[in-house]
Amino acid sequence: MLCEQIKEYVDVSREIVKVMVSDSAAVALKKSLDRQEAMIDLLLDTETEASQLIRDFMAVEEKVAQTLLDTEETKQKTSSKLQKIERELQEKIEKNSSLESGIKFLQKELEELKMMEEEIADMEREADEDTTTVIPSAVYLAKLFHNVTKIDWDYNCDPSLIKGIHYGGEIAQPISIDSNQHSKIFICNYLWSLLSTDW
C-alpha cells in the first residue's frame, strides 16, 4: 500500500512540473494540488492508525503478561495448599479411620482445589491463545512499517510532537517536529524527504 502511495506522490509531482513548464490552465494545477493534499491526508491517517495499533499492541501485551503473572502466582499458592491438604488427609486416614466427617470435608476441599487448578490451566491456555493470535499480527504490521520507513517512533512523547530516529542514511538522524507549528503538508514532505527512492 505504501509503495502505491509513493508512486501516486511521484505521479502528482510530475504533473505539477508539467503544468509549471507548459503553462497549462489553472484547473489542471488545482486538480494536481487537490490530489496531492488528499494523498498527504491519507499518509498522515495511515501513520496515526499505525501508532494506535502499536499502542494497542503494547496494552494487550502488558495485559497478557500481567494475567500470566497473576495466574502463575495463584497456581503456586493453590499447588502448595493442595499438597498440604493431601498430607493432612493422609495423616487423618492413618491416625483414625473413624473420622469420616473430617475426611469427607478434606476430600471436598481437595476436589474444589482440583477444579480451581483446572480453571487456572484453562486461563493459561486462553492467555497463550491471545498471545499467539493478537500479538504476532500487530508485530508484523509494526515491523513492516519500520522496514519501509526506517524510522523508530517515540510513542511516549507529547501528542503534539512527532519524534523518532531515522536510520535510513549513513548516520542516524533524530526527528522532532511540533505539529502545532508546521502544516501537515510540511511534515509529510519532510518525512518523505528522509525516505530513500532506491528500490
From Swiss-Prot:
Record's GO cellular component terms: Ndc80 complex; nucleus
Entry keyword Cell cycle: yes
Chain segments annotated as transmembrane: none
Keyword terms: Cell cycle, Cell division, Centromere, Chromosome, Coiled coil, Kinetochore, Mitosis, Nucleus
Family listed: Belongs to the SPC24 family.
Subunit structure: Component of the NDC80 complex, which is composed of ndc80, cdca1, spbc24 and spbc25. The NDC80 complex interacts with mis12 and zwint.
Record function comment: Acts as a component of the essential kinetochore-associated NDC80 complex, which is required for chromosome segregation and spindle checkpoint activity. Required for kinetochore integrity and the organization of stable microtubule binding sites in the outer plate of the kinetochore. The NDC80 complex synergistically enhances the affinity of the SKA1 complex for microtubules and may allow the NDC80 complex to track depolymerizing microtubules.
Full protein name: Kinetochore protein spc24
Species this chain originates from: Xenopus tropicalis (Western clawed frog)
